[in-house]
A protein has these predicted regions:
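PRPP-associated nucleotide enzymes
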Residues: 1-225
Length: 226
């Protein structure tokens, strides 16, 4: 079978397009969204498209009471939307009653829900790009405990999300909670090794000088590909 390759012209081909592309970034995921947008804009300009950005401005402002709302600042009607959210980004803060609070994974997920609410019913399709899978370490029940990740995926499906894209899920079998929804688990093994070789050029991968440490039993499968 011949190797299939897709170039910018194929990616933005009108007859193959589902709808106009749009990107949304939850608080804390702006950097990743901007990087993706930069590649998309460059590809679009290579084929003569006059576009400055695919990002639709959005925000999740908070009231003095601590409540928040999702705000999308442009029309998304009929768009193919990709929403970026990073539940593991603890550097995002907000002030509440004189105290600086850091966003927890629960806060990040709730911001995602707010933005989905803001565009649902208008967008052609909604996909979520979540580098760190929300609740990914609570994927199975061994005692009287919650199943946060499975229920979160079911909640997103119920809200109209068609596709989840995540990286190196703790246990990708959690996709069984939503068998009819697309779930893409991308393994970043190549990118990790590429970055390692770039920053540590004298690294030695021989068995006498190199050791891979797995943080827990569930991570051994992912590390085996290294």
């Amino acid at each position: 079978m011949a190797e299939q390759s897709m170039g910018p012209r194929d990616f933005f081909r009108k007859e193959a397009a589902i709808a106009d592309l749009a990107l949304l970034a939850c608080p804390g995921a702006e950097e990743l969204c901007n990087l993706v947008d930069g590649h998309l804009v460059r590809w679009a300009r290579e084929i003569g498209m006059d576009v400055d950005t695919f990002i639709i401005p959005s925000d999740c402002p908070r009231f003095q009471s601590g409540d928040a709302k999702g705000l999308v600042k442009a029309s998304t009607r009929g768009d193919d939307i990709y929403i970026f959210v990073d539940p593991g980004n603890y550097s995002v803060t907000y002030n509440l009653f004189g105290y600086e609070n850091h966003l927890s994974p629960d806060d990040h997920f709730q911001n995602l829900i707010r933005l989905i609410q803001a565009v649902s019913g208008r967008a052609h399709r909604i996909s979520v790009i979540m580098p760190s899978l929300y609740g990914g370490r609570q994927h199975r029940r061994v005692s009287r405990e919650s199943l946060d990740c499975a229920y979160a995926l079911q909640q997103l499906r119920a809200m109209g999300v068609k596709n989840i894209i995540t990286f190196d899920a703790h246990d990708p079998r959690v996709m069984n909670a939503v068998p009819l929804m697309s779930f893409d688990n991308v393994m970043p093994t190549y990118q990790v090794l590429k970055c390692l070789l770039h920053h540590v050029p004298d690294v030695n991968f021989s068995k006498e000088h190199f050791l891979v440490v797995s943080p827990d039993e569930g991570a051994k499968i992912g590390r085996a590909h290294v």
